[in-house]
Amino acid sequence: MRIVYCTDSVCILGGVEIVTIVKANALAKIAGNEVWIVVADAQSAPIRPLEGIHLVDLGVNYYTDYYGLKGFYKKQRLHKVHLEKLLNEIKPDVVVATGQNERNLLPLLQLPSKPLLIREMHFEKHYRQKKKKKSMLQKIFLWLSEQLDYLWRIKGYDYIVVLTEEDKEQNWKGWNNVLVMPNPITSVCDVKSTCEAKTAIAVGRLVEQKDFASLIRIWGKVTEKHPDWRLEIWGKGELEAALRQQIEESGLEGKVCLMGYTAEVLQKMSQASLYLLTSMFEGFGLVLIEAMSVGLPLVSYMCPTGPKTIIEDGQNGYLVAVGDEKTFAERVCQLIEDEPLRKQMGQAGLKESEKYRIEDIAQRWMQLFRDLLAKKSSRRNSR
């Protein structure tokens, strides 16, 4: 089977990029498959090794020589021409869009081979509306972006794949071509947490979506009862200076530590005893699966979408209403004060994480591709 993944880049450190590489590598190992990753921007080496993958850089470079809206649409036209030419040379069986810049282009391409077109949704459908809008112009722009995406271009795809049943049920009612496939665990760590260290951990980009400001306030409450525990936040991002200032003004230096970027996320998790997530929204919350895979209990905001799918409240962690910082702190304190409960929840999560192994997810994707191609062929032959 000839499979093409189209995405923005595999050089930028992000969840979509890592998941795309991991899935493509796994599919390339299956006999009879040939896999491509087609990117618009490849300014440096891929963030993960590519194993048996054809990497094609279209050289559009959205992130350089960018001159506003006019420049963006000029690059979109260039992207369309190059992508259409390449796909007509490859003649793939399946084309999967995982990025942002190609998502509205693929349904417009003239592809005589009629490949199966799949759009992967790595964010909850209405994620744009979850952002804190700062002006009327931004509100209008986000609304127009959503209308363009969901009322027009997305209908050109054969199938849309979302990450959770929650997203499908809440946001895609009436759509008969929406399917569910979770993300896989993207790394493996043989070392598991003992849940005995006096450390909690959170991982993610330091951006508005992750709401680490809320987590810092929560930890201020936790510290009042448990000053010997500390919180490590691993990641980089545009809000780093603001978060450092918040930590200093809250008197939490040494209690909350911004650790910076690490490529050894699972190893860092295995040295902690709790995983905490305060995101405003997620597409899936892969980091929760990764934390479970090293035996950590979880405390998470019940944001759309993902945490409700991953966490069984009271079994492998706790779910808390978004913004309820008091209850969140109480749940953290409960786990700090009850080591047997921490370990019990950690082991429950470890067992649950096994169903997200990349080998199993890759086989599920292959079966899905086969079924959808057979269905498309049957429809074509019946005309």
Regions found by a protein language model. Give the residues of each.
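Membrane-proximal helix-turn-helix segments that form the acceptor-binding/catalytic region
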Residues: 84-85, 139-159, 173
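Short His-centered aromatic/hydrophobic patch
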Residues: 97-103, 121
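Conserved acidic donor-binding segment of nucleotide-sugar-dependent glycosyltransferases
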Residues: 312-314, 318-325, 333-340, 354
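Aromatic "clamp/platform" in nucleotide-sugar-dependent glycosyltransferases that forms part
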Residues: 261, 280
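Short hydrophobic beta-strand element within catalytic cores of glycosyltransferases
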Residues: 297-301
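Carbohydrate-associated surface elements
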Residues: 166, 184
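N-terminal strand-loop element at the rim of the active site
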Residues: 5-13, 26-73
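A conserved mid-protein helix/loop that constitutes part of the nucleotide-sugar donor-binding site
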Residues: 17-22, 198, 205-221, 238-244
